[in-house]
């Protein structure tokens, strides 16, 4: 069984992430969404909240599971019996960053391959950082995130402001 992992922080998950998840799910027998703890990043949502939002977002995709993880991605891939990492590339800056990561992953686990997918055109500009910034400054984000995520972001931002 070909198992792939799509790792990320997903803070929050965007329509761009979900588009990539749906496309990758068609390519593999099983796709594991690896939600990284990322202690070095200040996140809007906790790891458990991000996992829950992704599970709610992906509930219609039977071959997709969502798992939180901390530590090295290559160790998580080994735990999940995954042989492929799926990564999204929006810009040349993404490519440079991902190329460095892929080189390190190959050193740590040579049998782990990376598959890079470019976003659908309507999502090429979209990032979690932009969504958070727009939401924090009172902008409307409904068109950029799944419905359950929109509600959660609005509630979280409102709670921070109170």
UniProtKB/Swiss-Prot annotation:
Keywords: ATP-binding, Coenzyme A biosynthesis, Cytoplasm, Magnesium, Nucleotide-binding, Nucleotidyltransferase, Transferase. Transmembrane segments: none annotated. It comes from the Bacteria. The record marks 17 as: Transition state stabilizer. Substrate binds at residues 9, 41, 73, 87. It is an enzyme of class 2 (transferase). GO terms for biological process: coenzyme A biosynthetic process. Reversibly transfers an adenylyl group from ATP to 4'-phosphopantetheine, yielding dephospho-CoA (dPCoA) and pyrophosphate. Belongs to the bacterial CoaD family. This is Phosphopantetheine adenylyltransferase.
């Amino acid at each position: 069984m070909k198992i792939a992992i799509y790792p990320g922080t997903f803070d929050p998950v965007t329509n761009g992430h979900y588009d990539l998840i749906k496309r990758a799910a068609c390519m593999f027998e099983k796709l594991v969404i690896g939600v990284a703890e990322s202690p070095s990043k200040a996140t809007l949502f906790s790891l458990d909240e991000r996992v829950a939002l992704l599970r709610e977002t992906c509930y219609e995709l039977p071959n997709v599971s969502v798992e939180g993880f901390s530590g090295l991605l290559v160790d998580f891939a080994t735990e999940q019996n995954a042989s492929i990492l799926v990564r999204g590339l929006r810009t040349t800056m993404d490519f440079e960053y991902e190329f460095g990561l892929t080189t390190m992953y190959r050193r740590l686990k040579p049998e782990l391959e990376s598959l890079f997918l470019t976003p659908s055109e309507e999502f090429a500009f979209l990032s979690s950082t932009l969504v958070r910034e727009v939401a924090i400054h009172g902008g409307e984000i409904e068109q950029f995130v799944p419905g359950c995520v929109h509600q959660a972001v609005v509630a979280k931002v409102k709670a921070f402001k109170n």
